[in-house]
Amino acid sequence: MDRRHLYFLLFLLCTIQAAIGQQRSFSIKGVVKDASSGQPIPFANVVVWNTTQGAVTDSTGLFEISGISPGSYRLQSSFLGYKPFVTAEFRLANKDIFFPIELEEASQNLQEVSVVASPFRKTAESPLGLRVIGFKEIEKSAGGNRDISRVVQTFPGVASTAAFRNDLMVRGGGPSENRFFLDGVEIPNINHFSTQGASGGPVGIINPDFIREVNFYSAAFPASKGNALSSVLDFKLQDGNKEKFSLRGVLGASDIGVSANGPLGKKTTYQVSVRRSYLQFLFDMIGLPFLPTFTDAQFKIKHSFNPKNELTVLGLGAIDDMKLNTGMEDMSEKNQYILSYLPVVKQKTYTLGAVYKHYAGKNLYSVIISRSQTNNKNIKYKDNDESKEENLSLNYRSDEIENKFRTENTFRLPFIQLNVGGNIEYAQYTNDTYQKQFTSIPRTIVYQTDLGIWKWGIYATAIYESYNERFTASLGVRADANNYSSDMNNLLDQLSPRLSLSYRLSDPLYINANIGRYYELPPYTTLGFKDNEGNYVNRTNHLSYIRSDQAGLGLEYRPTSYLKFTAEGFYKHYDRYPMSILDSIPLASKGTDYGVLGNEAVSSTATGRAYGLEIMGRWYNYKGLTFIASYTLVRSEFKDGRNMDTYLPSAWDNKHLFTFSGTYSLPKNWDVGAKFRVVGGAPYTPYDVEKSSYVEAWDANNGLYYDYSRFNSERLKPFTQLDIRIDKTFYFKKIMLGAYIDIQNILNSKYKEQDVYIKTGKIINPEAPVYEQRYELRPIAVSYTHLRAHETRRHL
């Protein structure tokens, strides 16, 4: 960032600071309800966490805490016969707010032990691998840029890739092994310009202003959340303000947006947002070879018919358009290399969903319906020259449409809670592909796909808590199937049992364990791949669900309500993973490039394993301080098709991950934060320069080929990065103004990749036959500094 720009911003902050008069105070209103029945709880205690300010609910469960200054808060609620509860963090800005609280019924003899309310949560179903991420961590995390995928990289077990990507590699798993839920509605991806068949991209889609909290599972996945092998991100969204209308504007370093929320009558609330990027101008100014533009929109409407029935309708959509910056004046060799292989990408995606909940005594019935569509287009021409049709090397167009119906039911009995449910889905996958390839000879892949798949599944979970809640156990089972082929249509072939245990050794010390078997359906790109004769190659190859057996054991120590330490060991075994027939490597080591993953012939023969140890300390918002310090020792290995007797490192075998991230709240609404991250060197496969130099080979691929006979035989150097952030929030009579400076990689550390080659355009043997002609290739060094600065102003 230019120093004059920085000085001007600091001067502006101080000038606005001097113009502020005395802050007003507001009220926090809400209702306390039984989590099972939805009935209001009268005379419950509600206090602002870590303060003495509070209130008692009236006979209808309503409460009001007045005289609260603007800022970020949590509420703590308790009542005899219920577990004490600390809410997610929320912001009180320039108006009163309404905040609902749900309390879970406690065991009959819980009053015999001392239970301290804490913002840290774990469940009987997921005592390991569950991290709850609050609003403030998303909002003010250094280097996070208010993007949940970047914030998650702070937690143990999560590796990251090169700059400008949000890929999630959790506990040694690949980027295609994650699932995402928005208030119970499954969404296909959470990133713009996402890699089809995986999950990564450069920028998040979800508006962070909508998020109340995120449950991040890296193990012990709930039986209701199927089709995941590495992680589940379960987003809990805020409701619209029940009291007053509010408007918010966001001006960032890369986008501009506006959102609104408020009441629609006495029983209905809403929130809606629209965002538009101007990254193409920024990237053009700093000389990047690609120019992305994105637009996204999001909404949520919630209607309460009565205390026993409620309906939520939500939607999320994005339009992405990435062009190549071929007209750059200063065309560096690195930019030439990127332009040589990067396709033009156009994507459209949306999800519409509805969640209906009915409270019946101590039971809860839920019905979830949704429809999602992802349209993806990738086009590439040789030397980016569109003047000649023969220069076309890739024309890929596909649609993924999913229609889903799911029911979830919770029954509460003495000491036992039962969760049962099922789902039925219909997916439509269409594809029109033209792609040039080169193996030992050039060839062209041309096919059209129109594939319809019915999918179904059932699950059940029984949760037990001892009379004093010293011991909890959860036994779950899930089964999935579909009509793609006879290898997948039997529920018993995908039977997925899981068991979780937790025991309190003493008041602050717990031992937790989990073991389970999990299944994941390969991506539609793999299911729908055809050969030139129109045959579903992978159906013939007996493609099946990917299977992973996982186990974990951990200790959790909570000396106070705001501090905890955890140590968790894990082991994951993979089986039936798709193995590329062309490359003889597992698809598990692919998926962090722009484009498509899985559109090739495979066999379900790859096996692998990931294992390691995670250590974490977390201090949560006490006396203004919040921090996470974590270290992960992880190994991720697979067997390739050339040597089935030896495990080789996967692309996510970083070995060592260390992160420290913290924020500190200063007087007068200042916040400062920092994040320091060390990522161990990732393995890589050297390029096959000889093969790549053939004219027919290079022109087909528009770039280099890997030498898979030396699969991941080399390793990059470790990478370190320091990010810092300064926030200032101003509260006026009717406006809240927030500004921040977020400087990523302030030490200008370089992420060094393996050297690459570019063609000079010269054929070194023009007299040879066409199939023997070679380009002259020149090596260049590639590194990324990822130095970025952000400023944002928001108005309410």
Indicate residue ranges for each PLM-predicted region.
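C-terminal beta-signal and adjacent terminal beta-strands/loops
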Residues: 575, 669, 677-702, 716-721, ...
